[in-house]
Design a protein with these regions (language model features):
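Extreme N-terminal leader/activation tails
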Residues: 1-9
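N-terminal acidic leader/helix
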Residues: 11-18
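Acidic, low-complexity, intrinsically disordered interaction modules
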Residues: 18-98
Length: 98
C-alpha cells in the first residue's frame, strides 16, 4: 500500500465532498427563490423543507410545506420549475482498485 496515494485519495475525496455540498446548497437556494417567486402565488403559506433537502435535490426534486390550516407537503420536480438538475462531481478511484 502506498501511503502517499491514499493521502491523495482522501484529500481528493474531501474536496469532492465539499464541492458537491456547495453545489447542492446553490441548488437549494434556487428552489427557495422559485418558491418565493412562483409557488407563493398558488400557496400563500408555503416554504421549502430543509430536512433531507440534500437527498431530495440529488434525486431531482425538492419538498415544500403548505399550511392551509393543517400542514401538508408536496414534492416539486426540479425540471417542472425550469431548474436544471444538480450535476455532482465523481469521487476519485481508490488506489487499491487496480
Amino acid at each position: 500500500m502506498n501511503k502517499d496515494a491514499w493521502y491523495q485519495y482522501f484529500t481528493e475525496c474531501e474536496a469532492v465532498t465539499d464541492r458537491n455540498a456547495e453545489l447542492v446548497e446553490e441548488k437549494f437556494k434556487e428552489c427557495e427563490a422559485y418558491t418565493e417567486k412562483a409557488l407563493k402565488k398558488k400557496y400563500p403559506e408555503c416554504g421549502v423543507v430543509f430536512t433531507r433537502h440534500a437527498e431530495a435535490i440529488k434525486a431531482g426534486y425538492f419538498t415544500i410545506w403548505i399550511d392551509t390550516g393543517s400542514v401538508t407537503h408536496k414534492n416539486i420536480k426540479l425540471e417542472d420549475c425550469g431548474i436544471k438538475p444538480v450535476e455532482l462531481y465523481d469521487y476519485p478511484i481508490r488506489p487499491d482498485y487496480f
